[in-house]
Amino acid sequence: MLGAFLAVVVLATAGYLGYVAARRSQPVTLPTPTGPYQVGRTIFEWTDTARTDPLAPQPDTARSLSVWLWYPGAPEPGETTAPYLPGAWSGLHIGGPAGLGESGFGVVHPHAVPDAPVADGRFPIVVLEPGSGFAAPQYTALAEDLASHGYLVAGVTPTYSANLTVLHDRTVTASKAGLPSAFDNSDLHGPAAEQAAARLLSVWVADARFAAARLAALDASGRFAGHVNASAIAFLGHSFGGAAALEACRAEAACVGAADLDGTQYGEVVRAGLTKPMLLVASENSCVTGDCTGSADASGRAAARRLVAASTGPVWCYEIGGARHIDFSDYDAYYLAAPLRKLLALGTNGRGVTLTVVSAYLDAFLDQITRGTPQPLLTGESRPYREVRIQHTPGSETSPPR
């Protein structure tokens, strides 16, 4: 009997592994951009010679960054789209046996054309910062959609804070200073986490402002000459990148608004608030908008409430039901085997759904603050997404705890 049982287990396991192998090899196309423009993509490596990198293991190292730029493009018909994560960037794939349950990056297809000509027009700047440990290319779906709506989207990978970045064709991994263990603590606003966040935030904010300045300078000559609207700069981020986006907007005079995607807030902006428009988008029962229940992060809820109360600019807050923290990245679009989905704590909305919803709200927010176009989606006059709960809009009272 035992032998027969073991044989059944072995056959079932082999069958499941075969199923996973087949699924991970099937093509995955990222969500189709919804704007009127085609999308181009190019990759820069920029060094801020004015800053010594405090996160680098070697002393006296200038701060260098990989910046992926997605932009409104005008490629020739039939041009081949860019590979999703070329060369050494493929190292972002989950390693070890667990990676066998993730779509191979060679079958993930974005929509941008590499180094395409720039479309006619002048376009606002959006600086995108990833979550801690993540790299900007892992937000390709959001970036491509924004670019298709007429934005220059500069994705900044924070060197030594990302698990992997690529500079000069060589991989650079995280350092202890760049990816502090204090963030592994359940209390993200405890003394150790606050100290680590303060140190890291200053670096990430400087990264975002440096990238915005370098992108603005591209308006003077070269491919992007005459295409950069440097008078309209917005900052966007996920997780810790969201905290950095808000603080960068507070510090940057040219900022016209900032969006935080499911990121616990830190820094002076929590105490002083933001005078510019602000968008906060939360996963289900996340505390980043100040509205959460149960055993959720009480200190994070308090920080978000202080931020909203102190802000004099317009504030929009939304919760996406069925979404979890990692769904704001391209992981929402990959095939992931069920055990891996559980390990990564992804949501229940189905592949690509959360990304589609987030893109729609980002598009609406940015169109309103950079172009003055009224957005029924933001006010709730238009409610196409059943997953979304409106928590706060300009002129409304902050939502009470549920």
Regions inferred by a protein language model and the residue ranges of each:
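N-terminal Sec-pathway targeting helices
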Residues: M1-L11
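Domain-level recognition of soluble alpha/beta enzyme cores
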Residues: V20-V126, G347-R351
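Short substrate-entry loop that stabilizes the transition state in hydrolases
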Residues: P77, V107-V166, V288-G290
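Alpha/beta-hydrolase active-site loop
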Residues: Y160, T165-H227
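The feature captures the conserved acid-bearing segment of alpha/beta-hydrolase catalytic domains
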Residues: V256-H325
